[in-house]
Amino acid sequence: MVKLRLKRCGRKQRAIYRIVAIDVRSQREGRDLRKVGFYDPIKNQTYSNVPAILYFLEKGAQPTGTVHDISKKAEVFKELRINQTKSNK
């Protein structure tokens, strides 16, 4: 199973997180399948590769709580619903 979760980067006392698609059994710092964005909690900046996130969500990837909140602010789930309604028609 694949999850979308945060992977810690940066230096001591200055954490930056990458949003990655990673196998559930991997460690937090383990090998990721693909980098799909980043999150800087100090500057409160985010970048999301929305098409990549949508691809993994459509394939059944589960976002963690924090990644879910970040994606919700970026309105990824609205685009997911739009894509699903288009494919149903």
UniProtKB/Swiss-Prot annotation:
Keyword set, alphabetical order: Chloroplast, Plastid, Ribonucleoprotein, Ribosomal protein
Main localization (coarse): plastid
UniProt-annotated location(s): Plastid, Chloroplast
One of the GO BP terms on file: mitochondrial translation
Record's keyword annotation contains Glycoprotein: no
Cellular component aspect of the GO annotation: chloroplast; mitochondrion; small ribosomal subunit
Molecular function per GO: structural constituent of ribosome
InterPro entries tied to this protein: Ribosomal_bS16, Ribosomal_bS16_CS, Ribosomal_bS16_dom_sf
NCBIfam families assigned to the protein according to its UniProt record, in alphabetical order: S16
Family membership noted in the UniProt record: Belongs to the bacterial ribosomal protein bS16 family.
Name of the protein in its database record: Small ribosomal subunit protein bS16c
Source lineage: Eukaryota, Viridiplantae, Streptophyta, Embryophyta, Tracheophyta
